[in-house]
Amino acid sequence: MRIRPADAKDLDAVAQSYRDLLMHEMEQTGYSNWKFGVFPTMEISHRAHNRQELYVAEVKGRLIGSMILTERQPKEYKNISWNTTSPDEKILVLQVLCVRPQFSGKGCGKSLLRYAGEMAREMGYSAIRCNMWEGNEPAIHVFRQMNFTDAGSGPFRPEGLPEEQDLFMEWDLNGDDRNRY
């Protein structure tokens, strides 16, 4: 598996991976609380790509997952009692981590998180923060396995969606956790 910054040629495949996941969730159990045609969208991936914040995972040239890594913290983050007290410029935010359903459970999500942690450490960040719908139990389980700790829960409004109750999580990159994953 190769993880790298996204190229413009990846954008269609990223959008298709969002559709694949949402179609799968419509047919099976849905955990993301995302909505088909509303969130996430091609526009979100374009914006992230233009800001150089979109990363993709691929196997043999086929996109199997993606994530957004940004320094911009959503306004709701101000209401959370985070475990680390680092200044904002030392925080990286992980958003819209998506793994194609046929690759779920095969380590792609963990590899993306591992990459985010390694990259953040190299760039001098002290923590990675994220949030997800409280009902996304599979993702919560994986994030906890990968050094993220719960920081609290509260309302969050994803772009274009109604407000939901989210779990806010944080990975303290200065902690002695490198052997956990």
Q: PLM features: what roles do these ranges have?
A:
Residues R2-Q16:
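A short beta-loop-alpha structural element at the N-terminal edge
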Residues I68-V96, S104, R157-G160:
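Conserved acyl-donor/pantetheine-binding loop and adjacent beta-alpha core of acyl/acetyltransferases
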Residues Q52-M67:
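Conserved beta-hairpin
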Residues L22-I44:
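Conserved GNAT-fold acetyl-CoA-binding loop/helix
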